[in-house]
């Protein structure tokens, strides 16, 4: 993470660095801190303190390098602890601009209340909140865990409710851009169209540095290229790791939005059409 933050410093082609907190702490300890079901042992208190120090060290490095840092989302059972640390980091490092960004998975029905709390806190403490919106990636696991442990399902009842929650979060943030910077990560064509239209309706510059669209590298390039061509800020999200580690991540991204299936078919048709066009060009 430190290397990626340093690499991004001064590089106009890298809009953000990203890190996933669960890679530097055990799942068991992160869940225990988040769920507050049991007291931590002395060893666990020490381990969590070291985790927090590393978390804040990443944020400090991003601040020192003037690099925006996205804190990736986690499972529901981990997220409370991550939210607490991210909120603290935003208060500390986002005084003049958004350096630290929280990730909100909008398939969770509690994320709009959390977003409103972030705004209230930003106004009270005097900072700029960084928010990244995605629909979400752990639906089946979330519901299974809720059923197993007997707590309410944290997920919106259906895709329509998730879409409405996502759209509401984007509109809310756009209505309070004096206290927010936003990164919208989605392959959903309608969501991208709505934000582009909203930027224009509000009379904002299309390349307003507070607003970025994002898609995964290799996915929905038709959306990315068209947005960029029209002058909007677009970044490609690039997960990198050993294949066995990164493949499950990519599969979750494809599964998280049921509309992706239709869009993937559309992308394949476009690719086939382009290949056919090139073949005709060669033969001519």
Language model features: what each stretch is:
Residues 1-284:
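Positively charged, amphipathic and often flexible ligand-engagement surfaces
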């Amino acid at each position: 993470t430190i290397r990626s933050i340093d690499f991004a410093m001064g590089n106009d082609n890298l809009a953000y660095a990203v890190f996933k907190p669960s890679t530097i702490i055990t799942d068991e300890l992160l869940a225990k801190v988040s769920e507050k079901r049991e007291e931590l042992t002395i060893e666990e208190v020490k381990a969590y303190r070291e985790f927090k120090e590393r978390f804040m060290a990443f944020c400090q490095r991003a601040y020192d390098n003037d690099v925006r840092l996205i804190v990736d989302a986690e499972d529901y059972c981990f997220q409370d602890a991550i939210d607490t640390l991210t909120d603290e980091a935003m208060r500390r490092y986002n005084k003049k601009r958004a350096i630290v960004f929280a990730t909100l998975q909008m398939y969770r029905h509690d994320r709009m209340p959390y977003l409103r709390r972030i705004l209230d806190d930003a106004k009270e403490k005097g900072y700029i909140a960084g928010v990244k919106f995605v629909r979400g990636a752990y639906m089946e696991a979330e519901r299974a865990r809720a059923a197993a442990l007997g707590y309410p399902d944290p997920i919106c009842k259906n895709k329509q409710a998730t879409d409405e929650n996502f759209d509401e979060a984007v509109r809310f943030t756009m209505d309070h851009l004096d206290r927010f910077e936003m990164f919208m990560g989605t392959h959903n064509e309608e969501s991208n169209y709505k934000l582009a239209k909203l930027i224009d309706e509000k009379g904002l510059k299309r390349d307003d540095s507070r607003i970025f669209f994002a898609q995964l590298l290799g996915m929905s390039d038709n959306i990315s290229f068209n947005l960029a061509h029209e002058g909007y800020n677009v970044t490609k999200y690039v997960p990198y790791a050993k294949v066995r580690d990164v493949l499950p991540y990519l599969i979750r991204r494809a599964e998280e939005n049921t509309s992706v299936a239709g869009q993937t078919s559309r992308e394949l048709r476009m690719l086939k059409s382009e290949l056919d066009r090139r073949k005709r060009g060669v033969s001519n």
